[in-house]
Amino acid sequence: MTMTETMTLPYAPADAPLERPRRQWGVALQALRRLLSDKEDTGQVFEIMGALNGDSTAKGYRRLLQTLQGGRLAYERVELEQRLMDGAWLDSFAAGTVGAAYRDFVRSENLSAQGLADISREKRSKIEVSHPYAWFGRRTRDVHDIWHILSGYHRDGLGEACLVAFSYAQTGSLGWAFIALGAALRTRGEAKHPYVQAIWQGYRRGKAAKWLLAEDYERLLTEPLDAARRRLNIAPASLYDSIPASAR
C-alpha cells in the first residue's frame, strides 16, 4: 500500500449529518468505576469517550483542515489501523525510529491496532460510518499506542493515567480529562510517590507539545525517536520516570 492509498472497509454511509452527542455523566461515571477497578478493561474508555466527548472530534477535524498538511491528510484519508497491522511495513523501520519503537512495544505487549479498533467498534458503532468526522475519530483512536512511544509512558496504571492527561491537552476531549481526574483522585492519598504531580505533568507536557493529530504518521514513524520528540517539543516525563516501575 502506498502512502496515498486508503483503507477499504464496509463503513456504512453517513446519509444524514452526524448529531452532536449528548453528554451522559451517569454513563461515564459508571464506566470510570469499572475502569479504575480494572485498567485492562479498555472498552470502558470508549464508553467514557462516547458519553462525554461532545463535538470535540468535529472540532479536531476542522482544526486539522487549518494546518499546513491537514488538507492533504484529510483528502487522502489513510486508515491507520490497516497500516499499523502491516507486519512487513513495521519490520521495515530502522532501529531507533519511532516506528521501530512502536513495533517492539505492541509486539512485546501483545497489542494490535486492530484489537483496539475492534473494542471501539463494540462500544461506538458510529465510528464506522463513512464521514470525515468518523475518520478523524478512527485516526485519533489508532495513534494512541504511538503516543505511548512519543510520550514515554508505559502501559502500567500510572502511565495510562499520565497519557490520558496528555491526550486531554492534545484533543480537548472531556472524556480524557474525566479519566485523568478519576485516576488522580484515586492516588491522592498515596504520598509516598508524586502520582498526582506526574499526572498533572502529563497534561502540561501535552499542552506544550505540538499538535500531534496534525502529523503525517506514515512519515513520523520513519523519524529517529529522539529527534521526533525534539521536533514535537515533547519534554521528558521526569516525574513519571522518577517513580519505580514496581510502584506505578
Model-assigned labels for residue ranges:
Residues 43-223:
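Core of folded catalytic or high-affinity ligand/protein-binding domains
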Residues 1-82, 88, 225-248:
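Sequence termini and other peripheral, non-core segments
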